[in-house]
Amino acid sequence: MIDYKMILLPFLISVVLTPLVKQYSIYCGAYAKENKRTVHHGKISRIGGVAIYLAFIITMAIFVKADRQIKGLVIGSSIMFFTGLIDDLIDIKPLVKLTLEVIAALVLIYFGISVDIIRLPLGIQIDTGIISFIFTIIWVAGITNAVNLIDGLDGLSGGMSVIVLVVIGSIAIIERRSDLLSIAFILAFGTLGFLVYNAHPASIFMGDCGSLFLGFMISAISLLGFKSSTILTLALPILLLMLPIIDTLSAILRRTLKGMKFMEADKSHIHHLLMRQFGHRNTVIIMCGLTALFGLSAFAYMINRNIGFLVMVIILLAVEIFIEKSAMISEKFHPLIGLWHRIQRKSRKIFKKVG
């Protein structure tokens, strides 16, 4: 079912192109500037996403038949890639970037990539109608920005994206979706080739052109793979992307409570908090490991709902406890730990009365 030439080619293209992109970007001044939020030193290229994009496009052109949905996928992802590239080179306003994300989502809808029908148990079907339109835009913009926000450490966004794409591809094998398998694995191995140079200490960054492209592709592939499906399968991409989703929602809540703008950057993301205690390389390993666990729970959920749900709950509880302990949202935000303390106090009172 898997054509090994199809996954080897994007890897090799990315491995060959990335050093060329690095040399060109340093020559033309497209390198990351040091500031209070960065964790790197020196001039490092920030348009490594060019290699990932070209590896994907070239391989798709050779191996994948361009039907209507594939055309929508390529056009929409190209809009996001060039949006990120322009932002990497000259900076664009957040509102302009968001507008272009909406346009890219509309392209997907036009080419038939959206959730039109949700099938519930007992044969019940819900025609989403206009809700499908809204859901697709929110989903695409949300996941695209979630992957973009998590791109703060060497190899983090790329590593997590590879894991998510491999899991989606593995699920596609079970579902006998050769089209989905091809797209997911081509993108995964193209990204893997880039990670050869992006692993800590990175000699090149993927930049917004890479993270926006990957985020958009993951959101689009998820819609393409779980279109017109049950609530169970619709939950799978959410489960796979749980870590960046949690990080994004925490950032929104944190910045709202502090009176900051949503697009205003800070150093309170999950990876920043972990790095203070575990260091750069170990933080990336932990984050990718958690993503793999979420992927495992998604895979287990397809095979056995009870086991998958149990794994998911345990991981979510661990992440929530970390968020509260690290004051990621606010020093006063600790509902789960607070609940546990209240239960402990009431238990002591009950035991004292019994005693």
Regions flagged by a language model, labelled:
Residues 1-248:
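"…together with the soluble PPM/PP2C metallo-phosphatase catalytic core" -> "…together
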Residues 20-45, 250-281, 347-354:
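Cytosolic, membrane-interface loops and tails of multi-pass inner-membrane proteins
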Residues 221-222, 292-297:
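Canonical bilayer-spanning transmembrane alpha-helix
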Residues 223-230, 315-332:
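N-terminal hydrophobic signal/anchor transmembrane helix of membrane proteins
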Residues 268, 277-293, 302:
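Alpha-helical transmembrane segments of integral membrane proteins
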Residues 296-314:
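Extracellular/periplasmic helix-loop-helix junctions in multi-pass membrane proteins
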Residues 333-355:
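Long, low-complexity, intrinsically disordered cytosolic termini of multi-pass membrane proteins
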